């Protein structure tokens, strides 16, 4: 049954009057959230299985984040990059420790994932080389440098020519990567799991091979952990499953628990490339956002949410696949970043059917439904989705019949 949308319709009309049309008109208008549940302006409730696209790792209205933000905003809200604050220093120290590199590591804070990747692009130029390698169908952001790295021509076409000397190779194919990297390559950019393109997991050993290839040619290995980091896959950084140390790691999304923050970590010689005056951010390292991030890290550690993400993700995958529904081919991903791969390109219809049933999911590809719920989601909430899923899939089939 389609939820009531009386107030939603009014909000949608207001949206269409004043907002840019790059997103289209949102199907619902959310008003509040608590834990893994959100409520719209017509009082319909939804289990949030997308978490703001892997942002709300502690769910909505988490008391630790509220306390940290409230304390900081009533103490000191903003300083610019001209002055230091204790929360940003502490957060940098904690991220360095979590990365665990055995060489010097330095941190730069910004406001988003695309900004972190933009800096990685700029840093690569400081090597004296200009060639870059990234993956076909990858997503690294929408600002110009990050867009050049994004291996999706449909997103790039309107903005060409793009910066860069970027070569895109098939994701997961070691031979193709090895053939593209040479002694003129500045950096290789890779996601540990390709989230936007359908939660695609590379073959075992791929990231380790990428580390070997880049080391052999003196190129930087940049690992984009914007979607996979902050414990989502069952390790704090997804690349840690492969026991490698990148030269650069980019972060955002879940780091701030809902507040905008990005981070750039560089190790070894790469940590010394950025020198006085070469980059900056007015809002980067904002004390309120860094305080929120520290609260996120504390809760992840004290409540064991990183390990829990792996356990719950395995359980969720098994539960969905055991339904043996004709529309489900497989479930791929790791931890609580999962993609339900469909046997037909019905993802948009299923996203709508799920929303009508009270579940927020994302059609990240025509044949893939992405799940990235808060790491605090309960087993019973996961079970409620698995129980409802056959009906959701059947409803999407019925809707297709109406369109025919």
From Swiss-Prot:
Keyword Thylakoid: no
Cofactor(s) this protein requires: pyridoxal 5'-phosphate
Alphabetically ordered keywords of this record: Amino-acid biosynthesis, Aminotransferase, Arginine biosynthesis, Cytoplasm, Pyridoxal phosphate, Transferase
Pathway in which this enzyme or protein is active: Amino-acid biosynthesis; L-arginine biosynthesis; N(2)-acetyl-L-ornithine from L-glutamate: step 4/4
Cofactor binding note from Swiss-Prot or TrEMBL: Binds 1 pyridoxal phosphate per subunit.
Reactions accelerated catalytically: N(2)-acetyl-L-ornithine + 2-oxoglutarate = N-acetyl-L-glutamate 5-semialdehyde + L-glutamate
Single GO BP term: L-arginine biosynthetic process
Main location: cytoplasm
PROSITE patterns: AA_TRANSFER_CLASS_3
Residues with N6-(pyridoxal phosphate)lysine modification: 253
Subcellular location: Cytoplasm
Residues annotated as binding N(2)-acetyl-L-ornithine: 142, 281
Main enzyme class: transferase
Pfam families: Aminotran_3
GO CC annotation: cytoplasm
Enzyme Commission no: 2.6.1.11
GO terms assigned for molecular function: identical protein binding; N2-acetyl-L-ornithine:2-oxoglutarate 5-aminotransferase activity; pyridoxal phosphate binding
Protein's UniProt keywords contain Cytoplasm: yes
Residues at which pyridoxal 5'-phosphate binds: 113-114, 139, 224-227, 282
Subunit structure: Homodimer.
Note: May also have succinyldiaminopimelate aminotransferase activity, thus carrying out the corresponding step in lysine biosynthesis.
Family: Belongs to the class-III pyridoxal-phosphate-dependent aminotransferase family. ArgD subfamily.
Name listed for the protein in its UniProt record: Acetylornithine aminotransferase
Organism: Mycobacterium leprae (strain TN)
Lineage: Bacteria, Bacillati, Actinomycetota, Actinomycetes, Mycobacteriales
Gene behind the chain: argD
